[in-house]
Amino acid sequence: MKRTLKMILALSLLGAPMARSQDNVPILSGALAFLGSSNGGANSYEPILAPVLVAPFGDHWLVESRAEVLGFIARENGTSGPYSGTFAATFDYLQLDYLANTHLTVTVGRFLTPFNIYNERMPVWITNLEDGPIIYTIGTRTSGSSNGFMVRGDLVAHPEWSVNYTAYFSAATTTENLQSGRAAGGRMGVFLPQTGLEVGASYQRFLQNGDYNAYGAYAIWEPPPIPLDVRAEFAHSPGGHGYWLEGAYHLASSRGTSTWLSRLQAVARVQQFIKGSNPQPGDFLPTVNVNQFDIGLNYYLPHELRLNGSYGRQYSSAGNANVWNFAITYRFLFPAWPGGHQ
């Protein structure tokens, strides 16, 4: 962990020498969060630091990195015994991008596995509910990150619609904090900007421990006049299949409204998982069928501070349980070295 923390510090200073001679300024952003959860009476707490570095150089090159320092504090026996904690540090991604044009970006290094939308687009400071979906590990094993290369861009771009694509290959890696599976896959989506609708599909071929396929579909709807966000995913693998559907609404008449009440956001999510006939080792999926609903409230305070609370009820043959969560999240953004400017 000490080695990883040193690498995180080094990355935060990476852009300083090159940016002094360029207009593009490396930016350090990310989030600091504290999460609490009670699942069936078992309480746990998670402090999280997730710094993100974006360092452009030249007209076509970009370095991107996100690290995560995560703590987990819980009772030793679940619902009894003294509290104990562990801390771990890892890199979610550390990648070099070559931006050829709007149709092609080439990435090498470690990157978030682009299966559906949750893994790439909903980090801790954006996700509306702190618990990830049950089907999250489908298409993202072994760590949610891939080590290899990726290409992405707009296949077709029109003012009224566009088609985006992503394709990648990942090598198997067992290095501490940099684990990944050997896999290949891709994603394609269609975006309609006037309606705020995007739909797409994902595919992955996992190439180790017995090759198998995973596939999925997603939808995002953000109608421009209304402060409503709707997101959904479906995913299937030999270990099971399922879906989640989530809606979030700011209590405002439009997206441009800014009042104390408009900072309040109501959230609801339903999800279902059906176990498969051929579970794979290390797929981290339930061994029984599961249904769950969650409701929550987010309040966005000034200065990038957010409060979150939610309640969920999980139903399965292994037993029903109440799931309570709360979180406080601070999002930061500033130049990567003292005296820098945007």
Residue ranges and their predicted role:
Residues G200, Q204, Q208-S237:
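Oxyanion-binding "anion nests"
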Residues M1-K6:
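Positively charged n-region of N-terminal signal peptides that target proteins for export
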